[in-house]
Design a protein with these regions (language model features):
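Conserved phosphate-binding/catalytic loop of the ribokinase/pfkB sugar-kinase fold
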Residues: 1-36
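Structural alpha-helical scaffold elements that stabilize or flank donor/cofactor-binding regions
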Residues: 14-15, 71-72, 112
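Short, well-ordered alpha-helix to beta-strand connector turns
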Residues: 18-19, 76, 116
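Active-site beta-loop-alpha junctions enriched in small/polar residues
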Residues: 27, 58-60, 84, 124, ...
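Distinct, well-ordered alpha-helical segments
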Residues: 35, 63-72
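Conserved phosphate-binding/catalytic region of the ribokinase-like
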Residues: 44, 93-201
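Short beta-strand/loop segments at the ligand-binding rim of alpha/beta enzyme cores
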Residues: 48-55
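Non-cysteine beta-strand/loop elements that form the S-adenosyl-L-methionine
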Residues: 76-84
Length: 201
């Protein structure tokens, strides 16, 4: 896989100085070479007030570890996770060691413990949450005829980040993310052309 050997280049180091948002995941960090490059890139990104560094947990098979997840959560300021991944992370990090904590409590704890600007929790047909230090936004999942769920999570994240970069409130960015993800699920393929009503939002 190409992402198993991402080298550090002068172009990459220069790009790190210019980005307003960057998204990374756990799978591309399965090789030491790419993991080191990703870490160096993230450490080079200037920590401006509006810079978004998004960690999409994106657990796949056995290609993750406590160390990779811990370091990634330390480096990000926005965390994207789904309900199944939250169970795994919660167990791995002992976030529900006394039992009884619900998903929302665990998410609020992650926001607090890692100093996050936002945490996105997607729950499939059961809706989605966005948590920040100041607020909590819930939105139900729209009912659509599902053609293909590939790309649903990525489109959600991309739309949410795009909204924040354009000055949307957390709630407005959340609404855009939900609408975009629902549309993607109704289309074949991971990258359908978005309709004008979404592009104009």
């Amino acid at each position: 896989m190409a992402w198993d050997n991402i080298p550090v280049t002068p172009e990459l180091e220069e790009l790190a100085q210019e980005v307003r948002a960057v998204c990374f995941g756990s799978l591309a960090q399965r090789s030491e070479v790419s993991r080191n490059t990703i870490r160096r890139f993230l450490e080079a990104v200037p920590r401006r007030e509006d810079t978004l560094i998004v960690f999409d947990v994106n657990l796949r098979q056995h290609f993750y570890s406590h160390e990779i997840l811990e370091e990634s959560m330390q480096l990000c300021n926005v965390l994207k996770i789904n309900d199944e991944e939250l169970v795994t992370v919660s167990d791995m990090f002992g976030l529900n060691d006394k039992g009884g904590a619900d998903d929302r409590e665990i998410c609020r704890r992650l926001v607090r413990d890692y100093g996050l600007k936002a945490l996105i929790l997607t729950r499939g047909v059961n809706g989605s949450y966005v948590f920040t230090p100041e607020e909590e936004s819930f939105m139900p999942t729209p009912k659509v005829i599902v053609a293909d769920t590939v790309g649903a999570g990525d489109s959600f994240t991309a739309a949410f980040v795009s909204g924040l970069l354009r000055g949307f409130s957390v709630r407005e960015a959340h609404e855009l993310a939900v609408a975009t993800s629902a549309f993607v699920c109704s289309q074949d393929g991971a990258m359908p052309v978005l309709p004008d009503n979404l592009l104009r939002k």
